[in-house]
């Protein structure tokens, strides 16, 4: 069996969960966090043998902040692919049942309130006031959030994968490898400096690697604490046979019904 592989570090930058795009101010601040923490943790890897893959929603393609980020990564000599078809895996915040949709609707309202009133306590009374009196959700993308919530985001996943994976395949020498490692991290998190090296020490096989323990860091106080969640956190590496990775139908089949990072074995 061949041990030749390609390693992506995948970062879903915009398009995760039930939040709409929060505006350029948020996006620019997020990029600065990414540069300071996430990107530096990748630049400091003891093994730099990986390719960065960042995914965004379609409207971010021509955003000046996106273009600035692309230029910055070129300046840092980081090989990176940008795709603009949203999230590249099943989003468990968009289940099809009505109960789940209503729960997510309540989450949207709560997070909108907390964004605009960070020092206030959110409860049912503030929820009613927000909806019936102030109606501030209109200012944070309420209509877009509802559209995303009820249209069935995951129903378009195969179509979105087709375009994004096609873009990757067209720009890679696919005869140079037989396996694809995809390590997921968010745009405000960090990897240990030996993460890539340790992942690549595992011979390719059809399966996944997970990070079960880690740390949480308070950037305001400099405090560091251990983090040991009871379920798998969203920092995992999926190891694909090449023929599965670049075929959207087989890509989805490969997950075998996984609907959340908590399902990754």
Kindly give the residue locations of the regions a language model identified.
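Conserved donor-nucleotide/metal-binding helix-loop-beta segment in metal-dependent transferases, i.e.
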Residues: 196-213
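Hydrophobic/aromatic residue at the end of a short beta strand that borders the catalytic acidic motif
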Residues: 191-195
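Short beta-strand/loop segment that forms part of the nucleotide-sugar
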Residues: 48-60, 82-87, 185
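Short beta-strand-to-loop element that shapes/binds the nucleotide-sugar donor at the catalytic cleft/hinge
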Residues: 209-223
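Short, acidic, metal-binding catalytic loop of nucleotide-sugar glycosyltransferases
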Residues: 37-49, 72
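Short beta-strand-to-loop acidic/aromatic patch adjacent to the donor-nucleotide binding site
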Residues: 177-190
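Active-site-proximal specificity loops/subdomain of glycosyltransferases
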Residues: 64-180
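Hydrophobic targeting segments
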Residues: 6-11, 22, 42, 50-55
């Amino acid at each position: 069996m061949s041990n030749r592989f390609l390693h992506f570090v995948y970062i879903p930058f915009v398009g995760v969960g039930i939040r709409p795009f929060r505006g350029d101010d948020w996006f620019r601040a997020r990029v600065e966090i990414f540069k300071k923490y996430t990107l530096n943790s990748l630049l400091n890897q003891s093994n730099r043998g990986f390719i960065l893959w960042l995914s965004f929603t379609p409207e971010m393609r021509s955003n000046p902040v996106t273009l600035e980020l692309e230029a910055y990564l070129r300046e840092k000599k980081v090989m990176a692919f940008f795709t603009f078809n949203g999230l590249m895996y099943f989003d468990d915040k968009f289940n099809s049942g009505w109960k789940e949709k209503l729960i997510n609707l309540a989450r949207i309202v709560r997070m909108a309130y907390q964004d605009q009133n960070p020092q206030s306590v959110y409860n049912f009374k503030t929820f009613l006031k927000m909806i019936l009196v102030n109606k501030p959700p209109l200012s944070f993308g309420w209509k877009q959030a509802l559209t995303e919530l009820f249209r069935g985001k995951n129903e378009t996943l195969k179509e979105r994968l087709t375009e994004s994976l096609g873009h990757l395949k067209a720009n890679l020498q696919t005869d140079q490898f037989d396996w694809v490692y995809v390590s997921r991290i968010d745009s405000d998190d960090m990897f240990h400096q030996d993460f890539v090296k340790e992942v690549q020490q595992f011979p390719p096989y059809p399966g996944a690697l997970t990070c079960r323990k880690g740390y949480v860091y308070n950037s305001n106080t400099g405090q560091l604490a251990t983090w040991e969640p009871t379920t798998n956190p969203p920092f995992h590496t999926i190891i694909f046979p090449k023929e599965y990775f670049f075929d959207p139908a087989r890509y989805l089949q490969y997950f075998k019904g996984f609907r959340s990072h908590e399902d990754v074995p």
